[in-house]
Swiss-Prot record:
Present with 7250 molecules/cell in log phase SD medium. It is found in: Mitochondrion. One of its GO terms (biological process) is reciprocal meiotic recombination. This is Meiotic sister-chromatid recombination protein 6, mitochondrial. GO terms for cellular component: mitochondrial matrix; mitochondrion. Residues 1-30 form a transit peptide.
Amino acid sequence: MLSHNALRAFDCSKVIISRRCLTSSTSIYQQSSVHLQETDDGHSGNREKHVSPFERVQNLAADLKNELKAPDSDINEVFNDFKDKIESLKQKLRNPSPMERSHLLANFSSDLLQELSYRSKNMTLDPYQVLNTLCQYKLARSQHFTIVLKYLLYNQSPQDVIALWVKYLETISENPVILLQNSSSRAHMQNIAITTIAYLSLPENTVDINILYKILQIDRKMGQVLPFNMIRRMLSTEFSSLERRDVIIKNLNTLYYQYTVQDSDHFLSQIENAPRWIDLRDLYGQYNKLEGEKNVEIISKFMDKFIDLDKPDQVVTIYNQYSKVFPNSTSLKDCLLRAVSHLRAKSSKEKLDRILAVWNSVIKPGDNIKNTSYATLVNALTDSGNFNHLKEFWEEELPKKFKKDPIVKEAFLLALCQTSPLKYDQVKGELAETVKTKKLFNKVLLLMLDDEKVSEEQFNTFYYNHYPSDGVLPPTLDTLSIKMYANYKFQAEDTRPQFDLLQSVSINPTDYEKVEKITKAFISVCPTVEPIRQLYKQLGTHLNARNYADFISAEFNKPDGTVAEAKNLFSDFLSYQKTRKRNVDNTPLNALLLGFCDKLYKSKHSEYVPYIEKYYNLAKDSSIRVSNLAVSKILFNLATFARNTQQLSDKEVAFINQFMRDLGTNEGFRPNPKDIQILKECDGITVPEKLT
């Protein structure tokens, strides 16, 4: 029997546990060996026709499912029938493995639990009793616990949730193969999220992330963390009507703040690996609104990453907010310097003036200019297109001691790599034993892969010198994506089609968040489309809309990509979306529109206009939002095409006029006046007065 002692082991004896959920939690089974054996039903002369154990289980599951789905089904009778038939089958099977591993039986059990969760208020039977029976016969899966945990939380029983979580951990320890390997990995994370919400909703509870880690048995040393995004989504959707939800949200923010303080390295890694600016914006928004003292290193990391994702305006906003909190922070000033080099400007000269203004007014007045500031100035001059000014600065103004400084030297070497077609042979002699700058390290890796004289052994020696295979120092996903491509490149031609890309860098395809991030990074580093297509095939069902958009963009951007394959990918996405039973996500369609706009701009061929029209109309007919970026690209390319074409066809004129009418009603978009003026001067084109 579980008791309060079960939780004292986790140093959280303050938690009160309901007796109802603690019953029947004794260890009830042992690990079984896995060998399918023929069943012998007796020695009578009238033997039944042989039926394999697998077929017996499948037939039983099908019968039970039909019984449950029948219009006049009595759920109590179904459950009793289930117990009787399972016991009978267990007696007939010499080896229960086919029963324990049956997906059909697991699916029926999920249906039974779900049905009972909806009906149980007026019934003597409840989901917990069913789950207990599943555990007794070693049929329980993670998703079965998920259903019951949700049921308990819906019914405002947080203590029962935590008690059931303890039973879940016991069941895992007793039978990990059956419970976890035959379950959805997402179900396990959901169980963690539900238990966390239950912990946050305990009355008179002082939130302590260390106590929660012990309850959940999360090992920070192994990089395990709480699924905060999943928790927030659950509180916004299925648990939005929970009592004391405001208290839960407040407690969650406290928990999140404790995480950013205690697990700051992991949080910094999260920022570093954010694949898109919208993800980074959400992450920053969560951190920015937290109560408590902020970490300047974290703020600086956000600023750096916003620049990498081409959002320098956001960096200026952050600087204006936090420069008052951290007035002497060199890192904030360095980020501002780098940000102004990325702000839009009419010329590189205008960018140079901004850089010098920040350098002279913000950084130079300090008593002691640091090496990081000189390195940032090198980066800023390079990124702004002022490399000639950088060479002059390096030769005439930079103090000699900083020319030998590793950080400054690496910044200059990276600038050379970015502005000149250097080969690996030209760079390797300038490298220190250890490269400190991640961007330079990644650039060197790519130069090595571009050099046919570099062997796999040389590449791996350089790579593992910086990121040992023991995983103590994990690489960024950008770096890992380069390693994944290297693993593919160094395979023999005849073995490449069978090569498992994700497995080669130890990434589980069911880790959707990590897969999404590394997919985008991998696509960006691949010089050809072939390994990208191979990754697409290997991902199979482990894709989301953003992945599809990235793969579609690759077909337009890579030298050997094709329009036909981009269209096929979009068709695959539409089929995938039907199975999700959700509104169609707009990112793949926008990727397709942007791709055709790019083709039209580069080729000047009219054959791409009908494609733009087709998919633009599809978006309208399907109520899919066309992004402002895609709208602006369509407008620009139609205007450019119309200006360069002697005579537009009737169909082209009709589409452009339709597009202009739509533009006139689009309140959320401001067109470029130059594009509007070009179209006004074209024969047959009517520009709505609102746009002029």
